[in-house]
Curated annotation (Swiss-Prot):
Matches recorded under Pfam families: KH_dom-like, MMR_HSR1
Physiological role: GTPase that plays an essential role in the late steps of ribosome biogenesis.
Protein's UniProt keywords contain Repeat: yes
InterPro entries: G_ENGA, GTP-bd, GTPase_Der, KH_dom-like, KH_dom-like_a/b, P-loop_NTPase, Small_GTP-bd
Gene source species: Rickettsia peacockii (strain Rustic)
KH-like domain sequence ranges: 358-443
Family, as annotated: Belongs to the TRAFAC class TrmE-Era-EngA-EngB-Septin-like GTPase superfamily. EngA (Der) GTPase family.
Domain of life: Bacteria
Record's protein name: GTPase Der
Protein's UniProt keywords contain Metal-binding: no
Amino acid sequence: MTKQIITLVGRPNVGKSTLFNRLSIRKKAIVHDLPGVTRDRKYTDGKIGSFEFLLIDTPGLDENPNSMGERLIEQTTKAILEADLICFMVDGRSGILPDDKLLSSFVRKYNKPAILVVNKCEKAFDFDKEYYKLGFDSMIAISAEHGTGLIDLYDEIIAKLPEEESIETNIADPIKGDCLQIVVSGRPNAGKSTFINALINDERLLTGPEAGITRESIEIDWQYKNNHIKLIDTAGLRKKSTITESLEKLSASDTINSIKFANTVILMIDALAPLKQQDLNIASHVVNEGRSIVIVVNKWDLVKESEKEAFQEEFYYQINTHLPQVKGIPVLFISAINKQNIEQVLDACLKIYKIWNKKITTSKLNEWLNFTTKAHLLPLQKGGRRVRVKYMTQTKTRPPTFKLFSNNPEKITDSYTRYLVNNMREAFDMPGIPIRFIYVKTKNPYV
């Protein structure tokens, strides 16, 4: 039995994202008092009491004649078509506005089961005739922020959905096993959402020429070559000095948080915008968090054929110069809008994810250590004794982390550590991922 789908619809700033977070098993949506914060439809597992369902949050719709408004309507229409039940939300403080009337007509034409949810009702609330004129036979007053009225909402949802579907325990999602979480990050307008839409063949994410369309992290469950993948589209990261709007600060922190919990990060670069320090800063942040990384240069179709070879040479030089700690990062050149080379990106993610999870036996590690330290001797200490690394073992994966036991670890230089790490990459085929060494002092410094 699949989960029932409930879609939240309403004009901007009526509290859809607040209710989405309230019903979600974990918080997902950015909440802000600026209209239009949500710009894509977002999915999460929701729960009220014992009833579990799939919840969709939609962009706030208003009378907007520009292309952005048309795309918001398209996103909401798709979410309505997917729904088993619609919660049409209005603001109880401001009352019924002209946009509410237009939207209610828009929703009712699809003949879906629907509930009018009047939000921001912290006090006792009486429905006047304006609410009845919207044409919904079920009306509930709630405060999503404070959680009041949710029991009434639960009862109304159960009444609206087929009993055998809603009351029974829902079977978990059919996709099982490890989930590879891939975060797509980069500067604004690099083509992150276009890339994800091309991969899944669905206009799930709002795209367009306006920089900063995606304002929060959007998660999409997907399967690729029998692998369960969660694709996460993030807001574009700008330099801190250029982030002035408070909502964008929230979006930036949401993106950074997504990177922290990712397995692999796709760093999207705009081929028409030169590689900037901010791109390198994002890559360094990913590496410092211990994530695996794939660099993708998008809009490759817009680069002149005569300039591509020189572009690639300069690009590889910049990456190798500024990110020496992760030599061998996969770099792919794609056109998301033309779907050129996009599957190669997923293949690279699967490959580097495998390396990121690599486990090396202790015997092989110490055989390698003995050979490598003899090929390039460690420095001498005072008194003529040589620094030694006696033994090493792998303590964890994701990223591969190793403990090395030395008689005097303080004397091991950063350059010698880089020598060991780079040698390990080649010996054990571990390109493009962070490798961490932890030095531990042996009890007997003379051993």
